[in-house]
Regions:
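Conserved MFS/SLC helix-loop-helix module at the cytosolic interface between two early adjacent transmembrane helices
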Residues: 85-123
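C-terminal membrane-cytosol helix-exit motif in multi-pass small-molecule transporters
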Residues: 196-214, 230-242, 259-273, 476-482
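Helix-loop-helix hairpin linking two adjacent transmembrane segments in secondary transporters
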Residues: 169-203, 221-229, 236-257
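12-transmembrane solute porter fold
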Residues: 33-50, 54-55, 69, 73-78, ...
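Membrane-interface helix termini in secondary transporters
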Residues: 60, 88-92, 96, 180, ...
Length: 484
């Protein structure tokens, strides 16, 4: 083992270092493990809700704020960008200063951002609020890492799977809840509800989640690395998200992608030389960690494609001959069971991981996702059929999302768990961004004109579903290269 690897395996006791279990056991005596899991899962659901609550509102924002749709679209885009940038930074700070502390810190911009959105007088203020909300995306990987610290070992696997699946519940519930609030209360009420939930979660974490006994491993923060990664991710994701609207061969998009490569290379050189890097590339290149991160990109693609295609198919007018004519609220209710299905299989996924290993669970999850897409492509005319297909796909997602953090955390030192898990979530976010661009291109490229309006064709929907199926299979193949 060389000197750098020796340094990586240092045994300084940090929050999350698990000398671990003895110290955390006393920390959980006053709080039942089930309560800890419930509170952190609720935090994960809240984070996911924040991402989806605004979706039913996107089409109304141009009218509400008298703004161009290209401007109001930033209410969604900016959340993805700040979330991707914030996750690795929060993860590294959590490894240094404490996961519980950073989890509470991540909730503060969510509370403030929700309030700003609720009172926003114009779209610029709304975008600022949404940017702050996006930082809370890092709560899920932080919560997963914290579970590893404060729970007895025999409960960790199931708890991580449940925490991972909380994203599915939030995504599934977000659409019907937001549609109902907009329809029966007001769009501002949507953000006041988010404000209240986030504030409540802050109090619950502060009161109920124990502090692990530890010594802080204070170290100089890698500001240069944080800035470099932030700029590289912003260039990459902005190029992917805006490629179709700005033009894939436009100077702006090409400049963003070229800038991504240049900045990423320079960032990599810096990270390999800094004593306490934001992302330790020596750890990231370890076999199982590297393979899992690559697989995460494909899993993220496959997970998100379903939520892009099925709602549009359900909401298209039945007069098209293939649309199912559902309202936003009805569509949300048809999609809601998939979130519960994802959570329901979390314990089964944990049992498979315990008995056969996280590699098997990840492969199984990816192949189950592929089956869901295959079924959806066959039953596009049926609401019940699509609901069943979405449930199958979400079950596979639940398996995969529960397995990936386990593979990552089993392959890194205790002092790097939060930052490595956060980086894995960033890889998944890149996959969802690519999915958004690819599916949008497929649907736009096969669109047809109906009464002067361009809409996705049935061929486009089927091609999108088959693309999701193929990507899920690729994710399973990549996962198979993990070592036991």
């Amino acid at each position: 083992m060389n000197a750098s690897d020796t340094q990586l395996e240092r045994t300084t006791v940090t929050e999350g270092d698990s000398q671990g279990i003895d110290s955390t056991a006393s920390g959980t005596q006053n709080t039942r493990p089930a309560v800890i899991v419930a509170v952190l899962a609720a935090a994960g659901i809240t984070s996911s809700l924040t991402q989806t609550l605004v979706i039913p509102l996107v089409g109304e924002l141009p009218k509400l704020f008298s703004a161009d749709p290209s401007v109001t679209a930033w209410a969604v885009t900016v959340t993805l960008l700040t979330g991707a940038v914030g996750m690795p930074i929060l993860g590294k700070l959590a490894d240094t200063y404490g996961k519980r502390r950073m989890l509470l810190l991540a909730l503060i911009p969510l509370v403030i951002g929700s309030m700003i959105c609720a009172i926003a007088p114009n779209i610029a203020v709304m975008i600022v609020g949404r940017a702050l909300q996006g930082i809370a995306t890092g709560m899920v990987p932080l919560g997963i890492s914290l579970l590893h610290d404060v729970l007895p070992p025999e409960r960790v696997g199931t708890a991580i799977a449940l925490m991972s699946s909380s994203m599915g519940i939030g995504g599934a519930l977000g659409l019907p809840i937001s549609a109902a609030i907009i329809q029966y209360v007001s769009w501002r009420g949507l953000f006041w509800v988010d404000f209240a939930i986030a504030a409540l979660i802050f109090v619950l974490i502060y009161v109920l989640i124990p502090k692990p006994h530890h010594e802080h491993n204070y170290a100089p923060f890698d500001f240069v690395g944080a800035l470099g990664l932030a700029v590289a991710l912003l260039c990459l994701l902005l190029g992917i998200i805006k490629g179709s609207s700005w033009g894939w061969t436009s100077p702006s998009i090409l400049g963003l992608f070229i800038g991504t490569v240049i900045i990423a290379v320079a960032w990599g050189f810096w990270e390999l030389r800094f004593t306490n890097p934001l992302v330790d590339l020596r750890i990231i290149r370890r076999h199982n960690v590297l393979i899992t991160n690559i697989a995460s990109i494909f899993v993220g693609f496959a997970m998100y494609a379903q939520s892009l295609i099925l709602p549009q198919l359900m909401e298209l007018p039945s007069s098209t001959g293939y649309g199912l004519g559902q309202t936003m609220l009805q569509m949300g209710l048809w999609m809601a069971p998939s979130g519960f299905a994802m959570m329901a299989v979390s314990s089964l996924g944990a049992k498979i991981t315990t008995k056969y290993g996280a590699k098997t669970t990840l492969i199984s999850g990816a192949l189950i996702m592929a089956c869901g897409y295959g079924l959806a492509a066959l039953v596009m005319h049926s609401l019940i059929g699509l609901t069943i297909a979405s449930c199958i796909g979400s079950m596979g997602t639940g398996f995969a999302f529960g397995a990936m953090p386990t593979l990552i955390m089993n392959g890194v030192p205790a002092s790097e768990k939060a930052s490595s898990n956060s980086f894995n979530t960033v890889m998944r976010s890149i996959g969802t961004s690519v999915s958004s661009a690819v599916i949008a291109a497929i649907l736009a490229g096969t669109s047809i004109a109906v009464k002067g309006t361009s809409i996705p064709s049935v061929t486009g929907f089927r091609m999108g579903l088959l693309a999701g199926c193929a990507v899920a299979i690729v994710a399973g193949i990549i996962a198979a290269f993990n070592r036991k």
